[in-house]
């Protein structure tokens, strides 16, 4: 359970960071 929660947390942070990057640099897309 702990490992699964850790992986979920890492994935969530990665997705949020990616979305923030896309919103900050929309001209690249």
UniProtKB/Swiss-Prot annotation:
Top-level division of the source organism's lineage: Archaea
InterPro entries assigned: KdpF
Deletion consequences: kdpFABCQ and kdpFABC deletion strains are only able to grow in the presence of K(+) concentrations above 60 uM.
The keyword Transmembrane helix is assigned to this record: yes
Pfam families, per database record: Potass_KdpF (PF09604)
Keywords: Cell membrane, Ion transport, Membrane, Plasmid, Potassium, Potassium transport, Transmembrane, Transmembrane helix, Transport
A GO CC term attached to the entry: plasma membrane
Locations listed in the record: Cell membrane
Transmembrane segments: 2-22
GO molecular function: P-type potassium transmembrane transporter activity
Membrane topology (UniProt): Single-pass membrane protein
Keyword Lipid metabolism part of the UniProt annotation: no
Disulfide bonds: none
Induction trigger: Up-regulated in response to K(+) limitation. Induced under desiccating conditions.
Functional note: Part of the high-affinity ATP-driven potassium transport (or Kdp) system, which catalyzes the hydrolysis of ATP coupled with the electrogenic transport of potassium into the cytoplasm. This subunit may be involved in stabilization of the complex. The Kdp system is essential for growth under K(+) limitation, and for survival under desiccation and salt crystal inclusion.
Subunit structure: The system is composed of three essential subunits: KdpA, KdpB and KdpC. The complex also contains KdpF, a small non-essential subunit.
Record-stated family: Belongs to the KdpF family.
Name assigned to this protein: Potassium-transporting ATPase KdpF subunit
Organism per entry: Halobacterium salinarum (strain ATCC 29341 / DSM 671 / R1)
């Amino acid at each position: 359970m702990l490992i699964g929660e850790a992986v979920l947390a890492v994935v969530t942070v990665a997705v949020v960071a990616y979305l923030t990057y896309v919103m900050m640099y929309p001209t690249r897309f």
